[in-house]
Amino acid sequence: NIAGLFGGNHRTRNFGSSCEFADYRDYIAGDDITKIDWNAFARFEKLYLKLFLDERQMHTRIYIDASRSMDYGKGRKAEQALRIAALIAYVSVCDMDKVSVYAIHGGTVEEVFVGVHGKDMYLEQIGKLNDIVFDGDSRISEALLPASVGYGDGLSVIISDFLTDDNYEDAIDYLCSKRRDVFCVQVLTRDELNPKIRGKSHLFDSENIKKTYRRNIDKQIIEAYRKAVEYVTSRIRNY
């Protein structure tokens, strides 16, 4: 039941061979006699086996929204997303865990690097993040539902602006059904949270350049926009 060939620093609810005591159980013929608690035997005149917490190498899987809307704004959301992914990946390898990074393009998941462990391998592979092209749209649920996401072996991280009509909650539920911890990071720019544009404006959909809008941006539109942003942020925050 070992999740990897290398021991990790994450303690699981499974019993294993670490040094941290977890519980007792009755001795059964064939058990490792070195794990018998002889002090307990002297007290209760019954054989008990010491159980220890299993330390496993977990697998962190990071999914980056590579849609064109992420390549927007001062400081670019894409750059922030890559920094966050690099940081989480580094923390994972420092915990002696494996890490894989994927880019979500449209309704597909594309490998950036897979199964990286150790700082040396991390330094060799992390530059591949710069090869991600942010273009088109992303449909998180469509991409993740058919993907191999692992089972009960670590953390799944989704990094996105979540500016989508996609029912991404289905993807979160799917990951949870695979007994994975799920962490969502929403990346938005200050302009998206508090737009400064006013007056007559020509707007376009960054993920579909055929969709354009001409609007006179007034206080009412800004107020409606802010309510929409609050819905988008609260939707992922409260799920």
List each language-model region with its residue ranges.
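Exposed, interaction-prone extracellular/peripheral surfaces
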Residues: 1-10, 26-31, 40, 49-83, ...
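A positional/architectural concept
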Residues: 15-17
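N-terminal juxtadomain amphipathic helix
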Residues: 33-35
